């Protein structure tokens, strides 16, 4: 055997030469040898490396070795060579016993003492290191033997047990069920049971026919054990076990309930055909009834079963509704803090929230407030489910009060780095601020405008975020006490350049449509007029108007020639007539500022305004066209340009319009155009006006001199309103008739991707025409109508003629309200009327809540 110097024992610092040291005596060498590990370890046991001791005694390592300089500390006496030999002999003789003690301790006789070879408690011996894998090997062999024994035993016992389970004596059946339950706890016998269809059928039969508690517990416990294996699930399903298990959901015994619901849960998760079988057996009703229990882990399993059954199945959703499921689910969200239960319950609510029947039930049960309680939960999956559900519900909750906590929480989560969280929060805020002044004020007071501006700035080109955020801002910047403040906040928060930039490509038409409405509202603030112009808003609006007008003219030419509607009539679900109306309406507000009028005039857009007066089938376009001409005609040169474009004839015809707004604007423009005419012409013109149905009161004319009246676009009637609710769902139809109609959305929404989620779409059709993707809730006919399925991105209320028929081919027209002729004056054109106080009154689609 050779010895090697350990690598960490260096002699480089030894000041003495070993050749100068005297040779120690044999006794001294023996004593120094005793200090090595051979004294306590043969080397075979520990595997320690032997080494030559230092003869100089000057090793640095030895200076710290207490055994080198304090012999009494390690040993109480010196050992002679004979004693060392005796110890080595004893260790050799007991080597086999040490190995046996480590590997087969059960074979040793009691009372035998085996000398230990472990010198250092921190260093296990070689035998000790081998002991653990040896024990594992031994147990594996034993288990293999026992497994085979269990399998053989079960195989031999199964035929007899089947007979006993079918016995008429219930005591015998009970004993047999308990025996089978015990066998099913072992893997080998469990496989033997599930491989026997006769045994599983006997268990199901015993479960169905017996009223004995022990029999029931044994049989259902066995089925529960089998349900952890796919083969067992198939055997239970084929044996008709699901109806028997559903029946047990009425059991008052906790253990039976646990076995039954967990077995059904496993079947629903992994066995094809189980969902239908559970529905047919009445499982939904029984599961909803179980929601009244208070064991959180049990409830988590029940709610997960409900989610599996309701997902993608409208009938199941209606059964849950009929069983008062929504109120129980909301109660759970309000009462517990167990994360898994809250998560599974929120998943059920998310599935139900796209059902038009369940949606109002959840809202009425306080679902919005209950879900809002968990927006600050550290569980991200719970927060996301709550947000998806809230967004699905939000179009049905536009009239719900007491949402201050929710609105504040939504503003907070707008700062999240998760794109899905921000998208949902913005969409919910958009819907909840639609036609609800209280919610608008609340959002403004908690910093919602600043948060939404920041969200738009940070979103970049993510339209799934920018579109709902722009819609929410559009609602917050008009028709409530804090609207003027909101308009200023957008400017002070550096939002104007970002918002105007969204009018450029690659923005899609639904987003552009929403931005146009927001710019119109922002222009209501005089301080925003110049910044909007400086950021290029007028130029971009005119460019969009040209594009939309060309497409509209092309469509009308095609319809006139062959009666067909070309594919290009819609772009991303948005009709170009909507863009025409929106851009002209925004230019109308911007034209109130003198320099803006000059810029608009220079864009060579007046001919288009005049041509729009001929859109007899779309009153709202006629109204905004007459409105912008009314503003531009303040300048005499522009009035002459308008007359030169041939506007006199269509304006004169519009004086007979049943829409007071159209008629009044037309009269105002004609009066401006007649300012340089003779006094006789003016008097004759005034006289003709008083003969029209809309202008019958002579007292309003102030001796034949026409002033300029208020902006009639905000004088509105409480007729059907188009609510631009932001939601998700397939393409929908905006109908001007009918009661509550909520959009049918998707059962669930992708968490990892927003692809395929059409957020926003085109305008609706008052004639029942298809809209673009992205259903939103909208208010139905008359003030009592509920939110319906309309499209997002803004649109107008459906204008109705005096005969009650729609006057617009798309859902964006709006008539002005009935007025006495004496109320019509033309004083103070620059004075804007107060916002309507009735939430059911809305302006054209580009106004706040459309």
From Swiss-Prot:
Species lineage: Eukaryota, Metazoa, Ecdysozoa, Arthropoda, Hexapoda
Subcellular location: Cytoplasm; Cell membrane; Cell junction, Adherens junction
Membrane topology term: Peripheral membrane protein
GO cellular component term, pick one: cytoplasm
Name this polypeptide is given: Armadillo segment polarity protein
Xref: Pfam families: Arm
Molecular function as annotated in GO: alpha-catenin binding; cadherin binding; nuclear receptor binding; protein phosphatase binding; transcription coactivator activity
Role description: May associate with CadN and participate in the transmission of developmental information. Can associate with alpha-catenin. Accumulates through wg signaling; arm function in wg signal transduction is required early in development for determination of neuroblast fate. Arm and Abl proteins function cooperatively at adherens junctions in both the CNS and epidermis.
Sequence ranges of Gly residues compositional bias: 758-798
Underlying gene: arm
Organism expressing this protein natively: Anopheles gambiae
